[in-house]
Swiss-Prot record:
Pfam families: KOW, ribosomal_L24. Keywords: Ribonucleoprotein, Ribosomal protein, RNA-binding, rRNA-binding. GO terms for molecular function: rRNA binding; structural constituent of ribosome. The lineage of its organism: Bacteria, Bacillati, Bacillota, Bacilli, Lactobacillales. Belongs to the universal ribosomal protein uL24 family. It comes from Lactobacillus johnsonii (strain CNCM I-12250 / La1 / NCC 533). One of its GO terms (biological process) is translation. One of its GO terms (cellular component) is ribonucleoprotein complex. It comes from the Bacteria. The gene is rplX. Part of the 50S ribosomal subunit. PANTHER family: MITOCHONDRIAL RIBOSOMAL PROTEIN L24 (PTHR12903). This is Large ribosomal subunit protein uL24.
Length: 79
């Protein structure tokens, strides 16, 4: 896959077209990625030990990898 975690990408299609962000996670099996600050969705969560109040939580949803283009690769300091 051409996108790796930590790369800076720009959305080229969809409702968030033009937005930029860093890749948080990659699912190579479904060709979907999660980009920070892009494709925000609201999820209703029940109260639990980690989230005592529960309620509506806003988080990033996944988008298809074909809808983004890489602006800058993550710098690898091990080279």
């Amino acid at each position: 896959m051409f996108v790796k975690t930590g790369d800076k990408v720009k959305v080229i299609a969809g409702k968030d077209k033009g937005k930029e962000g860093t890749v948080l996670s990659v699912n190579a099996k479904t060709n979907r990625i999660v980009v920070k600050g892009v494709n925000k969705i609201k999820k209703h969560e029940k109260p639990s030990q980690t989230n005592a109040n529960g309620g509506v939580v806003e988080k990033e949803g996944s988008i298809h990898a074909s809808n983004v283009k890489v602006i800058a690769k993550k710098e690898d300091n091990n080279k």
